[in-house]
Amino acid sequence: IYTLHSYSRNVEAFTFGTRLSRITHYLNKKDVSDAMELVNDTVKDWSGGTRIGETLSSFNLLWGRRVLSGGAVILVISDGWDTGEVDKLDREMDRLHRSCHRLIWLNPNLGYEGFKPLTKGFEVIMPHLDDFLPIHNLNSLLDLGSALADLDKTKNRVSFGAVA
C-alpha cells in the first residue's frame, strides 16, 4: 500500500477492525518504517476482531463519495473473518461494489493449500467481488501487480482497506 501510494497520490488507505481508520496521510512519510510506526501508534483496534459490515458502512457513508469517484478500484486486504451482522455485511458490500469500477478482495489465507472461504461472512461477500486473489507471498504481489496493470489506469482511482 505504501508503494502504491508513493506511485500515485490518488491512492487512499484505510484500516478496519472494529472501526474504520484513514491512514492515507501517514503514507506521505519518506521512510516506510516511519509510516508504519505512525500507523501502529494511531490505529487502536489491531487484533480486536473485525466487524466488516459496520466499518464498510462507515466508509460508504463518510468516504464513499469522496474517494470512489472516477471509477475507483478497491482493494480489500482481509482474511474475511467477521464478527458482525451478516445482513449488514451483505448490504454494505453491495453498496461498495455498486460504487466502484472494480472490487478486488485479497485474502492472505487463499494461497494456502486446503483453504476454503466457508464462513457465513464469505457467503455474502463473494457475490460482490470482481476478483478474489491470494496475498500471502511475493509471487502473489507480482500477480496482483499484473492484474492492476491490466486495468485502464487513466480511468481508475485506487482505494485500499487493510484489516487491522
What is each residue range found by the language model?
Residues 2-164:
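Acidic, glycine-rich A-domain
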